[in-house]
Regions:
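Intracellular juxtamembrane helix-capping segments at the cytosolic ends
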Residues: 1, 214-227
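Helix-loop-helix hairpin linking two adjacent transmembrane segments in secondary transporters
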Residues: 8-66
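Residue-level signature of mid-helix packing/kink "hotspots" within the transmembrane helices
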Residues: 17-18, 135-143, 246-247
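Interfacial helix-cap and linker-helix signal at transmembrane-aqueous boundaries
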Residues: 22-39, 116-117, 148-149, 253-261
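Juxtamembrane intracellular "pre-TM" segments in multi-pass secondary transporters
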Residues: 67-95, 301-306
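Helix-to-loop junctions at the C-terminal end of transmembrane segments
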Residues: 141-153
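C-terminal transmembrane helical hairpin of 12-TM major facilitator-type secondary transporters
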Residues: 155-219
Length: 307
């Protein structure tokens, strides 16, 4: 049940959704310059102070309620030995997968409110609520993704998740527009008009969040299977690079939008990222099949008539 356990742990990402739901009403419901209970300032400053109080409460709960004797399986290993797996290309491949699932999730969660307001002309509060519809499944489905990885295998779930992201982003990246045909008499007619409405967009982004939530669990299911003695070092690197992906993707979104002029180019970036991950993973699977089971590989690649 490693996949399920890691998925439950990772479902803490749902805190981003809670912030999207709770933050705007709290900011709007407090008065800038006022003070509540002597410690809570009004306006946007209310949020970080409330967060600091919650951190203190969580720290106290951790201190008093968690076991004080930590399990440290790598305590006897020197640091160089613990970091040795980082020389393997597999670790960096897992990291790229996590950039596609977690880094893209973080980047899109930050990008979507502005996208909604600019392209669908809705308020900030409505944009935050619609963004939460994407964030909730991307977080809460992580335990289910772990369960599916335990049952069907992490690699199969990766194929499903990346394939789903590929199809969804291919639809979302199509720009709104139409073909204009000029006629000999000087008139013009529009043909093949395409424009995605708010409801279809929200549904597709919701499905994209589902694929990301399941995929995040599948990536971390790989780590204890391939690196049982270095889960901390490998998991830390994979998580770090996934977080860095969430930092670098928004500027890339902005650059592609400025270069192309299409707001939907955001999803073109995610489409390319999904393609790279899917091709790298499939190429690795094919190479492993030829190396470890050459007879089976030849049988699969033979045409039916030759078998």
């Amino acid at each position: 049940h490693q996949g399920f356990a890691l998925g439950v742990f990772g479902a803490g990402n749902v805190g981003a959704s809670v912030t999207k739901f709770v933050g705007p009403p709290l900011i709007a419901g407090t008065t800038v310059g006022a003070t509540y209970l002597g410690i809570f300032p009004g306006g946007w400053r209310f949020i970080p102070v409330l967060y600091a109080v919650l951190l203190v409460i969580m720290g106290a709960m951790t201190w008093f309620m968690s076991p004080h004797a930590d399990r440290m399986p790598g305590a006897a290993q020197p640091l160089s030995q613990q970091l040795a797996p980082l020389k393997q290309i597999r670790v960096w491949r897992f990291s790229l997968y996590y950039v596609a699932f977690f880094g893209a999730y973080v980047a899109l969660a930050a990008w979507l409110p502005t996208y909604y307001m600019d392209n669908f002309d809705i308020s900030l509060q409505s944009a935050a609520y619609l963004t939460a519809i994407y964030i909730f499944p991307a977080s809460l489905l992580r335990p289910y993704g772990g369960y599916l990885s335990d049952r069907f295998g992490a690699r199969r779930i990766m194929y499903w998740s990346l394939g789903g992201m590929l199809v969804i982003t291919a639809v979302l990246m199509m720009p709104n527009g139409h073909i204009v045909i000029d006629h000999a008499d000087g008139s013009q007619t529009d043909h093949l008009g395409y424009a995605i409405g708010l409801t279809p967009f929200v549904i597709l982004v919701f499905l994209l969040g589902c694929a990301m939530g399941v995929g995040k669990a599948a990536v971390f299911k790989h780590i204890p299977e391939y690196f049982p003695d270095n889960v901390g070092a490998v998991g830390g690197l994979v998580g770090m690079l996934g977080g860095l992906g969430g930092f670098f993707l928004p500027p890339l979104f902005a650059y592609t939008k400025a270069w192309s002029g299409f707001p939907s180019s955001t999803f073109f970036v995610l489409f390319l990222l999904s393609v790279v991950c899917l091709l790298w993973m499939h190429g690795t699977v094919v190479r492993m099949l030829h190396t470890e089971s050459p007879g089976l590989a030849r049988h699969i690649e033979q045409p039916p008539v030759a078998r």
